[in-house]
Amino acid sequence: MFILTMGLNHHTAPIDIREKLVFKESEEEMALVTLQQEKSILENVIISTCNRTEIVAVVDQIHTGRYYLKRFMANWFQMDMEKIEPYLFFHEETDAVNHLYKVTAGLDSLVLGETQILGQVKHAFEIAKQTATTGTLLNKLFREVVTFAKKVHHHTKINENAVSVSYAAVEVAKKLYGSLDNKKIVLVGAGEMSELALQNLAGSGIADITIINRTKSNAELLANQFQAKVGAYENMNEHLMLADIVLVSTSAAEPIIKQAAMQDLMEQKASSMLVIDIGLPRNVEHDCSYIPNFHLYDIDDLAGVVSANSLERQRIVLELENTIEAEVRNFFEWEKQLGVVPVIRALREKALDMQEVTMTSLENKLPGLTEREYIQIGKHMKSIINQMLKQPISELKEMSVEEDATTSIEHFKRIFGLSETDVTVIEKEQAETRS
């Protein structure tokens, strides 16, 4: 079994490609099940966010695994494999695990150290677990990765004052207008990104904020937190006519701000308008950028502002990379030890069988034993067995991560009289449990 990651992100693919390869939340479970049915795929988790679509899989062979992951992606999004292949990356084994640690801790994000990705990875794992597309390896890996990322954010504080996409949006507005005093802003969407934008706008001098959302109650909840107004979704263009700055972040699958409508609007509008689209797929038609006085920015346009990270935070990243390498080594040592689990179980079962035979013999030879005495003798005998096996089992685990592990394990089985049949029976039981 091998761990293989395939994906595309803000490093490898522009936004016009990424927005075509996003798994809809309503289709997550179906995508997981469909991928699980592909040849070579033993386990899988799909992570799909505004900046990345990645699949973490356990495969029986690397080469065939790569092919079937690509085929699944092409079939799911109804695109030619040759069209998406140039934007894909692959990580195998240690590189795949290392990458997942960095992603979950926010070290690979457009926003260094951001915490949103931790929740997204955790959500992706929970959905996969509920859908039964994870097993022994990915269950262990994702639990370790999520725990590590939580510790990173708690102990290093890398997320404190982290430059966010929403922060970058506000900085772009300041560069265009200078002071934001008396500027009118319209937020289209009432999700997490809109809330982050409002937090960054606090204290910037903007007093006139209108929130527009298809579900009005969500807009009202957000407006109450930030003393903003609520506008009717059906009257969006009327609000845009009065706006200086528009920030758009919705989960719509298609653009909600169209070029034709904006062309008419800008011909009537007396002033310029800054429109920042942080949706993925994009919420504003790209052709709007050609309209005079319509200043359009998308997520990739904000990357330059976001990349201005402090030296202190970059120092933390270097330190974390060493820690991550140690975590990765620990994971693969654990994986190697999985191979001796059937041997350990076979050894324990053989010892318990011997105990049972001995207790039966004792009962026959000492019929006068009370039930309490019989139970006490059994407990003491089991304790002796556990003490006797503790050191050999510990040594076996150590041997399992050494170069000549196979030879050492065979010697161990011979010493304790464990046949191939003893071990194979346990292995079959484990396989049936996983399936």
Curated annotation (Swiss-Prot):
The active site is at residue 50. The keyword Electron transport does not apply. Its EC number is 1.2.1.70. Belongs to the glutamyl-tRNA reductase family. NCBIfam families: hemA (TIGR01035). Homodimer. This is Glutamyl-tRNA reductase. It comes from Listeria monocytogenes serotype 4b (strain F2365).
